[in-house]
Amino acid sequence: MGVTKKPDLNDPVLRAKLAKGMGHNYYGEPAWPNDLLYIFPVVILGTIACTVGLAVLEPSMIGEPADPFATPLEILPEWYFFPVFQILRTVPNKLLGVLLMVSVPTGLLTVPFLENVNKFQNPFRRPVATTVFLIGTAVALCLGIGATLPIEKSLTLGLF
């Protein structure tokens, strides 16, 4: 692989060519209106038609059909709601549970204002944000794991 020489922009011949537009890609067809008005809608409508066609002709069953007369013992939410579900399940007062749920995004919104004087992007030079992140991740993991266990074992995660 050879070394490419950078163009000398002080060369009058090169400057004259650049002034005429010779240094740019001047062949081919323009993107407007050809691509944007004719090719893009064909691709977008073709993608939508393929998706709708597959959904109509080959519907996939999502699990087994629901039985309205057989209710499971404990209804669990989706996995990403496990920490919030665990908060609501373990706190006896409903108002306190809702306040704890509201405190999570409120606490996350206050983190940038705690370290607004620190302009570093390195997490090791931002101790408050790093500590909040690590503690929040550990608490969310413990709450999420606890939500999958029965209520008797959920607070101790079955370890004690």
Swiss-Prot record:
Location (main, coarse): plastid
Superkingdom to which the source organism belongs: Eukaryota
Keywords attached to this entry: Chloroplast, Electron transport, Membrane, Photosynthesis, Plastid, Thylakoid, Transmembrane, Transmembrane helix, Transport
GO MF, one annotated term: electron transporter, transferring electrons within the cyclic electron transport pathway of photosynthesis activity
Role noted for this protein: Component of the cytochrome b6-f complex, which mediates electron transfer between photosystem II (PSII) and photosystem I (PSI), cyclic electron flow around PSI, and state transitions.
PANTHER family given in the database record: CYTOCHROME B (PTHR19271), CYTOCHROME B_B6 C-TERMINAL REGION PROFILE DOMAIN-CONTAINING PROTEIN (PTHR19271:SF41)
Subunit record text: The 4 large subunits of the cytochrome b6-f complex are cytochrome b6, subunit IV (17 kDa polypeptide, petD), cytochrome f and the Rieske protein, while the 4 small subunits are petG, petL, petM and petN. The complex functions as a dimer.
Protein name listed in UniProt: Cytochrome b6-f complex subunit 4
